[in-house]
């Protein structure tokens, strides 16, 4: 453990859900919320992520022609084992048949248990988008199906699918996510078939189920790739959609909507490829 760590505090007066989701897609060691501010801690510099955040906020200002006030503070602090302190705040969560728990909790009898590296809060099942995807996985994933997890993060969704008997491929634009997913797959005694740094555009085949739990803007940006990677009759699960962006996302996809799961402001959209095309 390093002697010092960096603490970043992100204070923003608008688009808070979007900003939190944006950061969760890029930082896997846990994000704390305190007094309406987001706090990220790391022994390595997160300056690059903060630069990306500033660029993202600038794009929101231009897109919505509005004012957004963003303040980022960075402090170097002595490391008094904040990781252990944070770990103790992580508790198990139950989503349908799945029971997601840190390593110091016992598995739950009668449930599909998923053990997550306790240093990882993102993708622990506590966020509404993760829970929506887990409910969709429980309903639609069958043994032997081929599934692609786009933006795999900590790997919790693809681990859940693998535990249901799916053949799983994973991808993420962040190489760290692939490393963390590998750790969690090993922790759970399951495997993914193939993983790559990149997105759906790099897929070499089509899948029975494609899952993308990412921010709405990115879903819209890669909509064509997500659809082209889904087999005829296949299922596309989209999450990370705030209610006010529902129609914007919906209009970008021409698959039929099977159902929508909503928790709070967050929507998980389940689509089916009824376009009558197959083959790549």
Curated annotation (Swiss-Prot):
It is an enzyme of class 2 (transferase). It holds the Pfam family PrmA. S-adenosyl-L-methionine binds at residues 130, 151, 172, 213. One of its GO terms (biological process) is methylation. Its EC number is 2.1.1.-. Keywords: Cytoplasm, Methyltransferase, S-adenosyl-L-methionine, Transferase. It catalyses: L-lysyl-[protein] + 3 S-adenosyl-L-methionine = N(6),N(6),N(6)-trimethyl-L-lysyl-[protein] + 3 S-adenosyl-L-homocysteine + 3 H(+). Disulfide bonds: none annotated. GO terms for cellular component: cytoplasm. CDD domains: AdoMet_MTases. Gene3D superfamilies: Vaccinia Virus protein VP39. It is found in: Cytoplasm. GO terms for molecular function: protein-lysine N-methyltransferase activity. Belongs to the methyltransferase superfamily. PrmA family. HAMAP family: Methyltr_PrmA. Methylates ribosomal protein L11. This is Ribosomal protein L11 methyltransferase.
